[in-house]
Amino acid sequence: MNNKKSTNVVWQETKIKRQNREKMLKQKGAVLWFTGLSGSGKSTVASALEKKLYEMGYLTYLLDGDNLRYGLNSDLGFKSEDRTENIRRVSEVAKLFADAGIITITTFISPFIEDRNNARKLLGKDFVEVYIDCPIEVCEKRDPKGIYKKARNGEIKNFTGIDSPYEKPEKPEITVETYKDTEEKCVDNIIEYLKQHKIL
């Protein structure tokens, strides 16, 4: 990978501003940053939230961690430096979506506080951290992709929660507890926050 920075570039201002797009869409651009262990319910809740918001007439886009590794991040592995670059790229993409006035939902384990804080710095007021709280015992029991078993057997290295750490959010804007609340209640809690903060 060529790490040389671009030179001789100038930011191009456009005639249509973010506020124009938000006015047309009747919504505020935002980034709902879902974080939690594998199997905690990030994708499940995010997908249900996107569907609910769509039914309510809002424009959304879901950036899924696995899906982006098929394209944009296909050159990255799961070592610490790759995870950091993964989150950096996603943050930049999410920033573009928010600027377009879109409610952007990201579902990434994003295990490191520093990486999430860097995303928060880049995205500013658009960043809404959504902690999908679920004990590892429950996640491992669910194991929808069969990867906890592989990690326990040593077939997968650097697996979050097993041989790589997950750093819980310190002050997330939203916490949903998927191990005791229904999918519907989790979605309703997030929507209530979005309404209270005039994103919807």
Curated annotation (Swiss-Prot):
Pfam families: APS_kinase (PF01583). Pathway: Sulfur metabolism; hydrogen sulfide biosynthesis; sulfite from sulfate: step 2/3. It catalyses: adenosine 5'-phosphosulfate + ATP = 3'-phosphoadenylyl sulfate + ADP + H(+). Its EC number is 2.7.1.25. The active site is at 110 (phosphoserine intermediate). PANTHER family: BIFUNCTIONAL 3'-PHOSPHOADENOSINE 5'-PHOSPHOSULFATE SYNTHASE, PAPS SYNTHETASE, ISOFORM D. Catalyzes the synthesis of activated sulfate. Belongs to the APS kinase family. This is Adenylyl-sulfate kinase.
